[in-house]
Amino acid sequence: MFVAAMTESDQNIINLLFSGHYADPFAVLGMHDTASGLEVRALLPDAIDVWVVDAHSGRKVANLQCRDPRGFFASAIPRRKKPFSYRLAVTWPQDTQVIDDPYRFGTLLQELDIWLLAEGRHLRPFETLGAHPSTLDGVVGTCFAVWAPNAQRVSVVGDFNFWDGRRHPMRRRRENGVWELFVPGVGPGQLYKFEIIDCYGNVLVKSDPYAFESQMRPDTASVVSRLPPALPVDEARQHANELQSPISIYEVHLGSWRRHTHNNFWLSYRELADQLVPYVKEMGFTHVELMPVHKHPFDGSWGYQPLGLYAPTRRFGSPDDFRYLVSAFHEAGINVLLDWVSGHFPADSYGLARFDGPALYEYADPKEGYHQDWNTLIYNFDRHEVRNYLAGNALYWTERFGVDGLRVDAVASMIYRDYSRRDGEWVPNYFGGKENLEAIGFLRYTNQMLGQHHAGAVTIAEESTDYAGVTLPPEHGGLGFHYKWNMGWMHDSLAYMQLDPVHRKYHHDLLTFGMLYAYSENFVLPLSHDEVVHGKRSLLDRMPGDVWQKFANLRAYYGFMWAYPGKKLLFMGGEFAQGREWNHDTSLDWHLLDEPEGWHAGVQQLVRDLNHCYRQHPPLYQCDYLHQGFEWVVVDDRENSVFAFIRRDADGNEMLIISNFTPVPRDSYRVGINQPGAWREVLNTDSWHYHGGNLGNQGLVYSETVGSHSRPQSLVLALPPLATLYLVKEA
């Protein structure tokens, strides 16, 4: 192979190209109009011979000279004055190929995209950044783009170039630090990463933050995949998310809901569509909440330490398979909520951590950027590009996968700089306060953006403090969420239920206190996965007493919860009273439903009936967030641990709910009512259908003109032990 002579200046540039320290490869490679005419230059390590081929005629027009034995070729093109489309005929040691030169194509990102990305206001950054199979000038390939403003050089590497960072260095867009390159011949299914020489000279190999598909762990490469098309917004699904609609959520961890019995392996997305969807529908839940399905390296994080926010985990199948699962839920009339982790990410070397050398996606100061509880890094909400990455992801899941809402994880850790930190371990905000003003601004923007551009999608905050206005609109000083988990109600009610009934009269306020703040936010009542792990025990195991009392307590509690103001959430396994804590490595204990005693099957039947009763009776849901929707009747019967209240819909229709939280039956318990006449017992958690004792009122109960509880009319009821009753006024 003949090597042509080079000037010292030319050789320096070539050396920089091969060492990976030349930041503008397009200034050297490709076709250039020089003083001596058109010239083509190519960087092709291991090539033996290179010809320029006219792309239209297919004729060879020039043999490129080898200017460096490492694989740099260049020559003037004789008798050509105007730039033209060309290809390269390359002879390798094993064969000859005709390839398209990535460096003959112009810039990829439009000026408006560049500006919007820099400002953090690009509505759909995922349409611009990442890997996008495309056709340019009739050439099929993939457009790659990645934000790495501190990098000295970025190359795209993959199967298509032997993972060799010398072969495809990218163009730097100095306006905003994005690197871009169109690589001909690369298509869906091919693996890739970005090789980055950071500002310190270190070579890093990173997965694509915007990858739509990734390899199954422990492999870490991104996969070229087409952007899923946008899905239409369904009016019925929008209505199902509204404040005045019934919302009963089944929280699911896809990897442990059910597994293959012969090898304990996960069900796929499509198998879940066949098994989980009909089960949720039969059980009467209106919504399903999927614990995070983003790419995450560690099974034990349950998805809450994601490293690929735009890629559904490959544990259960492809992105198309996940879309199939979401569609199956929708066809069954079930809305899909997705747990969304926008506060922190793990520090795995191939991920976002120190992406191009210094802290980029995370805060640089560990007092701001390191989460001690979870050993993770905290997103730098002060950077426009980081906020854009996250906000765009929220729209991506709702718009491209049809997800109906996002449950935002660990909001308190985002909005407070001193979250889980002692004095001296956190950095105050600009005004000296503890609030993370940038994170608050991000949440407000994201909630507003979703409301404007994906009507009907809801956001739910897991916020564990008393921060005011979580569900108020941003224009009124709030964060803009639609709903907030009621952690206070959950803690108080479980604390009450764990007490031996003989002691409950001394803690009566645990069940009444919640109504003092029930209308301060739009609350969801959560019995989530967090309540059945880390030694807290299962819900059933937390109930006091013998077997009969444990199940009766749990049934009475569920009855109370389903009637209490607020939307409902129950973690999988709770619907049939799983006896042990949740284990993400195994299936739920479905065999319990086959036990001859029938305790677990009884609870499952109760939850099914509670859901259907809840959906059929507007007083139980229509005015959850209006004072008119709830009225205490019996609030102070500490001695008997009895609670009674009215639920009311917008038309004034009423339901009476009464709970007896002692194991003592109350045979003639008088309860005041507003509306005289016949009242029908429509649900009794002590029914034999639920494996209870079947004490109750056997259908209709007629009012008496006897005053009680400051009301002129009353009912005399038989209250079963450890039970909740629902009664409806007959028309």
Swiss-Prot record:
Protein name: 1,4-alpha-glucan branching enzyme GlgB
Role this protein plays: Catalyzes the formation of the alpha-1,6-glucosidic linkages in glycogen by scission of a 1,4-alpha-linked oligosaccharide from growing alpha-1,4-glucan chains and the subsequent attachment of the oligosaccharide to the alpha-1,6 position.
Gene source species: Dickeya chrysanthemi
Listed HAMAP family: GlgB (MF_00685)
InterPro entries: A-amylase/branching_C, Branching_enzy, GlgB, GlgB_N, GlgB_N_E_set_prok, Glyco_hydro_13_cat_dom, Glyco_hydro_13_N, Glyco_hydro_b
Activity over temperature: Optimum temperature is 30 degrees Celsius.
NCBIfam families: branching_enzym, PRK05402.1, PRK12313.1
Gene3D superfamilies: Glycosidases, Golgi alpha-mannosidase II, Immunoglobulins
One GO-annotated biological process of the protein: glycogen biosynthetic process
SMART domains recorded: Aamy
Enzyme class, spelled out: transferase
A Pfam family per the record: Alpha-amylase
Family: Belongs to the glycosyl hydrolase 13 family. GlgB subfamily.
Keywords for this protein: Carbohydrate metabolism, Glycogen biosynthesis, Glycogen metabolism, Glycosyltransferase, Transferase
CDD domains referenced in this protein's UniProt entry, alphabetically: AmyAc_Glg_BE, E_set_GBE_prok_N
